[in-house]
């Protein structure tokens, strides 16, 4: 088993965490003992000064988990039916997170395909979207607010190979329709050659550009 990412890993700026989660594994242990594992290939960063962030300017019951110290989960529901998994980032009370948008299945593919009712012969489409990630890994609101630096809740991250900047593309986030600056912010990060991405060809290629060395650290200052 690879090293589990520590809580301290997540207690940094959302952009840094979103970048460094790419290539890491997201692991879900089911009640049966089976472990489902996927390589993270798409993330989105959110910070409290961002109007599109659920924690922007206020602490609501829905977003309460976002104000915990980085390293716990924030699971919410969209459209009344789909769950989305985030890892809380930064410091206590800040209200920041990274959304896990897509993974490439590594193990437990047949179970994941069954959970999302997809063809197991096409694993790259099993978890290509935030709602599908949660369906494929059986993640729901019962896993909101759990410690992701421990195996206790059956959901955690494992360290993966470090990806070079040349392998990463930045794009605007998907589904953001607030102020123009927020819409244009390149805070969606993708593994360039992945076949499991959630966006359209235009979103993944036409609106994308290669990540620049040290850009993420500079944005976090």
Curated annotation (Swiss-Prot):
Superkingdom of origin: Bacteria
Signal peptide positions on this chain: none
The keyword Transport belongs to this UniProt entry's keyword annotation: no
Molecular-function annotations in GO: alkylbase DNA N-glycosylase activity; DNA binding
Coiled coil: none
Keywords: DNA damage, DNA repair, Hydrolase
EC numbers for this chain: 3.2.2.-
GO biological process, one term: base-excision repair
UniProt key word DNA repair: yes
One Pfam match: Pur_DNA_glyco
Family: Belongs to the DNA glycosylase MPG family.
Protein name from the UniProt record: Putative 3-methyladenine DNA glycosylase
